[in-house]
Amino acid sequence: MSFYTGRYVRSHGSTWNSFPLRVGEMTLGDHLRPLGVRTVLCGKTHMRADLEGMERLGIDPTGGIGALVAECGFEVWDRNDGVVPDGAAKNPSQYNRHLSAQGYEGANPWHDWANSAEGESGEIKSGWLIENNHLPARIAEEDSETPYTTSRAIEFITQNTQDSWCLHLSYIKPHWPYIVPEPYASMYGPEDVPPPIRSEDERSKASPILAAHHAKRSAQFFAREKLREKAIPAYMGLIKQIDDQLGRVYDALKETGQWEDTLIVFTS
């Protein structure tokens, strides 16, 4: 939310995932819209609307300006924040519906295909488990999250060649679950992972914040060399996939005559 508002967390109040952004906070879209610039979302935000505040002010979150306020000032082209692993979301994402339409079976193809591998006996091996991260995702590469999001972004770019626009292309990867389809699953191995730089003082003299981080399960997992050697090569493959997909975006901008007029800003 700090990217979208230009304000510190303590100022805008959205301190963690799923904490609503207060209604009334000015976002990128609020500044660009009066200039005639469409501000469009394709991908992930983790934004949670301040429905209580909107109700208090009589703002309908489903239409007009209320729909923009409920989506952090963005016009939603395609939003994908991922799905919990134990079943379909109450409101399935466009991506999950796309996978179902492509013939991927199950109530939650986001998890069962895009973010899981397949065991020797055909069982689903969840990508949420680091011990499975070295395995290739079950899904065809072209149907995985990063190419899908890229294709949706290209649809917007090619359909809006005459408009002034700001496209927030927000890839959900590389992010948990750390799993990627072939050919990226095999591109990197343990030999490509730089050794960690560690000091015993980091543990014995850790600040309260660092000590709390050390106590987290994820930190304990990544302290184990065997798990690092499975997760980090997959993470590197996910980054390489984004590199390749950005090439498709650049080609679309060039083919539609918008390359010289487009400012590309990377954030992470």
Where does each model-flagged region fall?
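Formylglycine-dependent sulfatase
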Residues: 1-268
